[in-house]
A protein has these predicted regions:
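Short, glycine/charged-enriched secondary-structure capping and boundary segments
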Residues: 49-52, 78, 105-108, 128-131
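A glycine/threonine-rich phosphate-anchoring loop and its flanking beta-alpha core
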Residues: 11, 107-147
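ATP/NTP phosphate-donor binding region
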Residues: 1-89
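A short, small-residue-rich loop immediately preceding and capping a beta-strand
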Residues: 82-119
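Short glycine/serine/threonine-rich phosphate/pyrophosphate-binding segments
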Residues: 20, 43-47, 72, 97-104, ...
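Short amphipathic alpha-helical surface micro-motifs
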Residues: 16-19, 43-45, 96, 114, ...
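Short, surface-exposed, polar/charged, turn-prone segments marking secondary-structure boundaries
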Residues: 41-42, 62-66, 90-92, 118-121, ...
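Fold-independent oxyanion-binding glycine-rich loops
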Residues: 17-18, 38-40, 93-95, 116-119, ...
Length: 147
């Protein structure tokens, strides 16, 4: 029997020393109104470099420190922020839960998503799903993405 293997990969992958200083240049085609969903440590690590990459632009940037769990309530909160502020790109900055929250938010709002992993061990940037929890932190579901 023939065994097939499939790999899904991001449309674009950028890596290198101080690559965040090139964030805007590399991602500008996606939009001009950005929601950054960040873990606390991800925000501290990435914020200044990302902001430097936007120097001289008029792009809107909104940073949100998320609640720590990719819960239904947290995702809905981020979706409301997107809608209220007419944002058109979602960025996840941090570990797995921040990234899963960003992927789910972008999916439901039909927006592009950018992943900035700050934890080496997370597989959230590479998987076509998000793990969703209830607001009491019990497991809810897996959200599988079509592409």
């Amino acid at each position: 029997m023939l065994r097939l293997r499939m790999m899904r990969a991001p449309q674009k992958y950028v890596q290198g020393k101080d690559s965040l200083l090139q964030f805007h240049k590399e991602m500008t085609s996606l939009g001009d109104k950005w929601l950054f969903i960040c873990s606390r440590s991800g925000y501290k690590m990435a914020h200044d470099k990302i902001e430097k990459s936007f120097e001289g632009t008029s792009d809107v940037r909104q940073y949100e420190i998320f609640g720590g769990v990719s819960s239904t309530g947290e995702i809905e909160k981020m979706r409301e922020i997107v809608r209220e502020n007419h944002l058109n790109v979602v960025v996840g900055v941090g570990g797995g839960s921040a990234i899963d929250t960003a992927k789910a938010t972008a999916h439901y709002e039909k927006l592009p998503v950018v992943i900035v992993p700050t934890v080496v061990a997370t597989d959230a940037p590479c998987t076509g799903l998000s793990v969703i929890y209830n607001d009491d932190e019990t497991f809810n579901s897996y959200l599988f993405y079509p592409k």
